[in-house]
Amino acid sequence: MLVLMALAAGCAGHKKDYPVTPVSFTQVRVNDAFWAPKLETNRAVTVPFALQKNEETGRVDNFRKAARLMTGAYQGKRYNDSDVYKVMEGAAYTLMLHPDPQLKKRLDDLIAVIGKAQEPDGYLYTTRTIDPGHPAPGAGQERWSNLRVSHELYNVGHMYEAAAAHFQATGERSFLDIAIKNADLLVRTFGPGKRRGFPGHQEVEIGLSKLYRLTGHPAYLDLAKFFLDERGHYFGGEKHDPKDPFAVYDSDEYLQNHKPVLEQDEAVGHAVRAMYMFAGMADIAALGGFPEYAQAIDRLWENVVGKKMYLTGGVGARDTSEAFGDAYELPNASAYTETCAAIGNALWQQRLFLLHGDAKYADVLERIMYNGLISGVSLDGMSFFYQNPLESAGGYGRSAWFEVACCPPNITRFLPSVPGYVYAVEGEALYVNLFIGNTAAVVVNGRTIDLKLETRYPWDGAVKIAVGPDKPAEFAVHIRIPGWARQRPVPGDLYEFADASDEPIALSVNGAAVSIDLERGYARIKRTWKKGDVIDLLLSMPVRRVVANASVKADAGRIALQRGPIVFCAEGIDNGGKALNLALSDRAAFRAEFRPALLNGVVVLRGKARAGNSSEGGKISSPKERDFLAIPYYAWANRGAGEMEVWFPRIRD
């Protein structure tokens, strides 16, 4: 094996990393009324549900067949192995937060089967091991022969992430050793002077970086960079007839292979692939010390956030190829905005924050998390959206599972990691990025700081943070002041508030007002802190009208509603059976009202709308005033399918 050193020694030897360090989700205990129930539903419902679905659909049986524990043909798509790994990662994170002997045994049993399915040299791709002569369509006739399509590297990238999570949760090496054995095979196979190629679906780069973090072995990070650097330089591999269903993989734009990654300045192609690639590039920038990678993803960020992101934080406009569209191409009814793309975007935004320490990335992260990401899972945790459009004529409903089931497993692994997005540390500074009720123990410059954050966010903008160092100590607390509270729904000019708000932001320590002098979007409070100190932040939450950049043709003459970080929508069930016939007047007033019995407890917006007959171009004819109710976008389609609208025709009067 390549890895001979002790894992801890490898970690200690790192010289480069992200300048900002996130506080691990294992150090943060979420207890608020918004996120805590979602995390518990994921633990108690969604993770077991997804584990069972992997059994029912033959995904786990594929490993048993590869291990010769049972006979039969491979079932499903060539990438189905990855769904097993992703749910295992989510289960491992869940174990860290909530020890569960039965869940651990289930993971142990799966790991044992995966180990038996692995070939002697480390290769792990069940469809080829089961029947080397007839693997699933797209797998290629030989190992690595069809990397654009096969997902051989994508699958094991998710395996590396799951194995790292399992090791961190249990301290046991059973899964990690399987991952290392496979990664060592990749190191022997690919690289300068060896086999050329790149993964058709990015992900292995992230997984290799995680293995590097755990082992300290530079070959893993070098290989991640090699795969990225091959893009735009290597054009080999199998090709397809234009009528072949796999012909889309011949498109270099679809795979982000149209230019070298360091020259790319526009997000193109498959959105999930792009998000995973950008996140992987951030890892190389930080862990490898390559500033040119940071410069490249900074350019790409300007393009995505400035021209290609939905108000909900979703990305990927086209259902054809699940891809980005042109600049400002953001249709609502046909928006693809895949749940996996939202998760990938969140992973990327967090890495950009860790690189730069700027609140604008946390602003985008918050928008994604509270809107276009959690819309992907139902409130009961048992049905899902693959796509997350911003308009529906009633044809969209949630599904219990999918043949291409990447999104539900991705939800299971993201949600338990949410506590890890709240705080971060840089030198003698503590960052407070998300306002999620919790208790935490955070180490700042060698001192342990007990924190208690209390809030009803996102329904209320009052935030109280009790700061308790083990002994009096001087350090800085950087509190993010959200862009939405500073007249900016998003960084840049893709979206703006149509109405002004002069409601102040109030910040105090122990009851004494503190002036807010923003630095990269943070209110910075540096003082000698002692037990019992309390920070109070008050963010006003008026209902705001949002307008899109004039170049976004789909939103021309329309407005959306936002309060705090939450984007709202109207559903037909609350508005006389229809939502697409509603227009909103500039003079209409909306009031926020908390309804504890609705949709697990939400704030709704009530007011008046004009209802009439909708027509092409979004105009409403013969409008009449009627009562109007809007709910948070993330909660739509939890009461059955029906009409839904985010962007409403605007009546200027």
Can you name each region flagged by the protein language model?
Residues 9-10:
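C-terminal motif of bacterial Sec signal peptides marking the signal peptidase cleavage site
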Residues 471-477:
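Extended extracellular/luminal ectodomain segments enriched in beta-structured repeat modules
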Residues 224, 297, 363-371, 376-468, ...:
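C-terminal beta-rich recognition modules with glycine/proline-rich loops and embedded aromatic residues
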Residues 16-19, 66-84, 137-155, 188-201, ...:
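Solvent-exposed loop and edge beta-strand segments that line ligand/cofactor-binding
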Residues 13-83, 108-134:
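Low-complexity, Ser/Thr/Pro/Gly-enriched N-terminal "stalk/linker" regions
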Residues 27, 33-37, 88-101, 157-172, ...:
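Well-ordered alpha-helical scaffold segments within catalytic/enzyme domains
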Residues 288, 292-336, 342-397:
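Non-catalytic carbohydrate-binding regions of carbohydrate-active enzymes
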Residues 67-79, 85, 89, 95-202, ...:
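Extended ligand-binding groove/face enriched in aromatic
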